[in-house]
Amino acid sequence: MATVKVTLIKSVSGRIPNHKLCVKGLGLRRIGHTVEVQDTPENRGMINKAYYMLRVEG
């Protein structure tokens, strides 16, 4: 299955709680942290909710 590289580029401090949970669900812990996640509808939904804090490649 295809993968997507996701990087946290903005802080989760002061954000909507559901968006914080989406970032945590993607496995991101700190600013600049990059993870590779599978390109599934579930992960795409989390990325779409918190898009303004993330950089997505691939």
Curated annotation (Swiss-Prot):
Keyword Zinc: no
GO process terms (BP): translation
Subunit details: Part of the 50S ribosomal subunit.
Keywords recorded for this protein, A-Z: Ribonucleoprotein, Ribosomal protein
UniProt record similarity statement: Belongs to the universal ribosomal protein uL30 family.
Organism of derivation: Pseudomonas putida (strain W619)
Protein name per its UniProtKB record: Large ribosomal subunit protein uL30
Record GO terms (molecular function): structural constituent of ribosome
Any one of the GO CC terms: cytosolic large ribosomal subunit
Matching NCBIfam families: rpmD_bact
Ribonucleoprotein recorded as keyword: yes
